Regions:
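Conserved alpha/beta-hydrolase
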Residues: 35-55
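Catalytic nucleophile-loop/oxyanion-hole region of alpha/beta-hydrolase
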Residues: 24, 50-82
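Hydrolase active-site cap/lid region
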Residues: 104-149, 162-163
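Short alpha-helix in the alpha/beta-hydrolase fold that links the catalytic acid
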Residues: 165, 179-188
């Protein structure tokens, strides 16, 4: 990959995972600048089928693909092999679709120390009926599908009781896609004795310009960097 580091010192590393748009965009660029300027290696990636990644036919009625978890695991493994990565300080970040994929990937992989999630669905059983009610394009459950081989039992609220990683859950008070109660359900199920935080951004929504990162940049920067340097 085309990148350059100031030196060969090992640094904490953050892997950033997009939402269901799936490819590297302006959000990742802005976030990469923020964390790189504060001493982190930053890794972004395209899902297969997006950007410069391999072709992969997708049905837009599917909320996700199991291959996305395979891709995430491959990125984590590649990061672990890099000589400038502090292997004890690998964090992951994701929002929306990327949020639940990020928590599952962190849960599955011993190399990940913690994760930062924003706009996180608690489970498909919670999210799909809710999305049917609020989706601007009038989606039905027939248009909100999950692959048969996707590990549904590893969705955030279901793995939370056994989750032993650092976790920062961010949610906008006005998020109508993954409302506050979903993040509260995940947070309340987490075990005691781990570094965990639920952060509510007043006036923020789910994504786009309403994403918490855009609503309060300074708070986002302070909280997320503080979380990873705890």
């Amino acid at each position: 990959l085309p990148y350059k580091t100031l030196d060969d010192n090992r640094r904490p590393t953050l892997i950033i995972c997009n939402g269901d748009a799936g490819n590297m965009s302006y959000q990742q660029i802005s976030l990469a600048y923020l964390y790189a300027a504060n001493g982190f290696n930053v890794v972004t990636f395209d899902w297969r089928g997006f950007g410069e990644s391999s072709e992969f036919e997708m049905d837009t009625d599917y909320l996700c693909y199991t291959e996305m978890l395979t891709d995430y695991d491959a990125v984590i493994k590649a990061v672990c092999k890099d000589k400038v990565v502090d292997k004890k300080q690998i964090y992951t970040m994701g929002w929306s679709t990327g949020a639940y994929l990020t928590m599952i990937a962190a849960h599955n992989n011993k190399a990940v120390k913690g994760c930062i999630l924003s706009g996180t669905p608690s489970s498909f059983e919670d999210a799909i009926p809710h999305l049917v009610k609020v989706h601007p394009k009038g989606k039905t459950e027939a248009n909100l599908l999950v692959p048969d081989d996707f590990p549904r039992r590893k969705m955030p609220s279901l793995i939370a009781p056994k989750f032993r990683k650092d976790i920062l859950l961010v949610v906008g008070s006005e998020d109508n896609r993954t409302p506050l109660w979903m993040s509260e359900k995940i947070y309340n199920a987490l075990p005691e004795g781990i570094n965990k935080k639920l952060s509510i951004y007043e006036g923020a929504g789910h994504g786009g310009t309403e994403f918490p990162f855009f609503v309060d940049w300074e708070r986002w920067a302070e909280e997320t960097i503080g979380f990873m340097t705890f």
